[in-house]
């Protein structure tokens, strides 16, 4: 499984499909928007998992939003540990974090 992270609109989905050749049906986009969050085991079944970076930017005022952000961040950390490869996309440019 490949984990792809980056800011919203940074080109993560295009990178997964065009550069890496990941099939859309085997790619989970927008992990941060899934409710409830999928389990780690479920996510490991995808070819690629795409998530917005949630550790940067303005911290939400609402406790529930902060808790959600924390849960997404921790899940991404666990995914990164298990992923074969981790890429960060910034302005459409990939940076290999793990290979």
Summary of predicted features, one role per range:
Residues 1-26:
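Glycine-rich P-loop/Walker A and Walker A-like loops and their local beta1-loop-alpha1 context
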């Amino acid at each position: 499984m490949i984990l792809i992270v980056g800011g919203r609109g940074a080109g993560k989905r295009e990178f997964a499909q065009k550069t890496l050749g990941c099939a859309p049906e085997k790619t989970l986009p927008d992990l941060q928007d899934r409710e409830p969050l999928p389990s780690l085991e479920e996510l490991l079944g995808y070819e690629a998992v795409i998530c917005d970076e949630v550790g940067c930017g303005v911290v939400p005022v609402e406790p529930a939003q902060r808790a959600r952000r924390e849960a997404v961040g921790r899940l991404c950390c666990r995914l990164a540990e298990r992923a074969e490869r981790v890429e960060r996309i910034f302005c459409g440019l990939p940076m290999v974090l793990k290979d």
